[in-house]
Amino acid sequence: MTTDLSSLATRIQRLEDRTAIVDTVIRYATAIDRGDWNAFASTLTDPVHIDFSEAGLPAADFARDDFVGFARQGLEVWTARQHISPNHVVTFDDAAPGRSSTAHCQSYLYAQHYHPDAAGVFLMRGWYDHTMVRTADGWAIAALTQHISWVEGDRNAPTT
């Protein structure tokens, strides 16, 4: 039995890329929850295309720092946040098999926001579509579309 090492190397590279993409998506979510805005920024390209139109924010290209500031301002009013992003489906744009420079990752969205003065929690459920690009520092989110299936609670945190 012979082993095609180039094919094996390609398959290993694909697994490494998939793992790095999923890790980037998870770091995006956990950085939000921890308020680690430098880590959050490191998951994004500059500029980054954001489409949160289903939540009321029209799709637009943002300078990375502008989007980080926007996210920080909107999320830090909540005392606690939990963003869960499971069920990752990664597909690659195979211009160069085994060394793709772009990929797509779809993941579920479960975002819970808590404030002690709110009447309950604010929950969002749906999914994300991430367009990922390979950069000198690894994979990063170049475009993000948020799809909302349903929400519960009041999206406006008390401003006490």
Please provide the spans of the model-predicted regions.
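Intrinsically disordered, low-complexity regions enriched in Ser/Pro/Gly/Gln/His and often acidic
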Residues: 30-31, 71, 131
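A beta-strand edge to alpha-helix "cap/lid" segment located at domain peripheries
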Residues: 2-9, 76-160
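Short, low-complexity N-terminal intrinsically disordered segments enriched in polar/charged residues
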Residues: 1-30, 34-38, 42
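A solvent-exposed, acidic/Ser-Thr-rich amphipathic alpha-helical stretch
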Residues: 37-109
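Charge-dense, low-complexity intrinsically disordered segments
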Residues: 11, 15, 58-61, 119
